[in-house]
Swiss-Prot record:
Protein name per Swiss-Prot or TrEMBL: tRNA (guanine-N(1)-)-methyltransferase
UniProt cross-references to Gene3D superfamilies, sorted A to Z: 3.40.1280.10, tRNA(m1g37)methyltransferase, domain 2
Species assigned in the record: Corynebacterium efficiens (strain DSM 44549 / YS-314 / AJ 12310 / JCM 11189 / NBRC 100395)
GO molecular function, one term: tRNA (guanine(37)-N1)-methyltransferase activity
Gene responsible for this protein: trmD
Keyword S-adenosyl-L-methionine: yes
Length: 291
């Protein structure tokens, strides 16, 4: 990869370190493109990618073995994963540092958003790095998780393959990490790398300063518990379809109310269960036909 040099626009010196351990490190190349690449370039993000096979021994560098108790597939070995996570937690391995894929114009950024506290369960040391293990058996990943994790200093991803990682690795890792097993949906992927790309993008875009306009994520789907409503741009009429007139009214209160109504109606139609956690006003209830 070609090195990219640019001015550092991160004036508050706040930086998130991501380390990813995988048997397919090349799969993580998208982490250096687009918004994440810009975050690397501007000094908000550092990414290290580590090949799990670097900790494997023997001629074949095997990282998996047959499961105890029988059954299909292979399980990833603890004697490979354990040392890998030990070294990454301690910073004893340099890894493959991702550089921004494309140079950008150096435009100063300003953002007033305050971070949120690190998330730690009772009895956990909040100063330990956060270990995320993508697995369909994990807790569903949410926007609230992304917001909380955007305030972390160091996140490590352990990408499983085959039938997953020996569970003892997860249990042992709690001595050095705050561990979260997390799922990005009710489906099964070939490995954890895709989930890493999803989670990393959701988290990094919420770091103050990464997005140029704070409203870009304040008005996201799920930021207020609702799905985001429709968006429109030029031309005003396209293939016989018109942009709603209210958007040309110049009345910000009317526009905000319309957007709220559209978000409510879309949520009711697509994800009605989300409304249970939303504090609805009298006007909201009228829009939804609940009064």
């Amino acid at each position: 990869m070609n090195a990219v040099t640019s001015a550092n626009n991160n004036t508050d010196n706040r930086r998130l370190r991501l380390d990813v351990v995988s048997i397919f490190p090349e799969y993580l190349d998208p982490l250096r493109h687009a918004l994440l690449g810009k975050a690397i370039e501007d000094g908000y993000l550092e990414v290290g990618v580590h090949d799990l096979r670097d900790w494997a021994t023997g001629g074949h560098k095997a990282v998996d073995d047959t499961p105890y108790g029988g059954g299909p597939g292979m399980v990833m070995k603890p004697e490979v994963w354990g040392p890998a996570l030990d070294d990454v937690a301690a910073g004893r391995v340099a890894g493959w540092e991702l550089e921004s894929a494309t140079p950008h114009r150096n435009v100063a950024r300003h953002d007033e958003l305050a971070g949120v506290d690190k998330h730690a369960y009772e009895g956990e040391d909040a100063d330990l790095p956060l270990l995320l293990v993508p697995t369909p058996a994990g807790k569903p990943f949410t926007q609230a998780d992304a917001q909380a994790w955007s305030n972390e200093n160091h996140i490590v991803f352990a990408c499983g393959r085959y039938e997953g990682i020996d569970q003892r690795v997860i249990e042992d890792a709690r001595n050095r990490y705050r561990v979260r097993e997390v799922s990005i949906g009710d489906y099964v992927l070939i490995g954890g790398e895709v989930a890493v790309l999803v989670i990393a993008e959701a988290v990094v875009r919420l770091i103050p300063g990464v997005l140029g306009n704070r409203r870009s994520h304040e008005e996201d789907s799920f930021s207020d518990g609702l799905l985001e409503g429709p968006s429109y741009t030029k031309p005003r009429t396209w293939r016989g379809l018109d942009v709603p007139e209210v958007l040309f009214s110049g009345n910000h209160a009317r526009v905000d109310r319309w957007r709220r109504d559209q978000a409510l109606l879309r949520t009711q139609r697509v994800r009605p269960e989300l409304l249970d956690a939303v504090e609805l006003t009298t006007e909201d209830r009228k829009v939804l036909g609940l009064d």
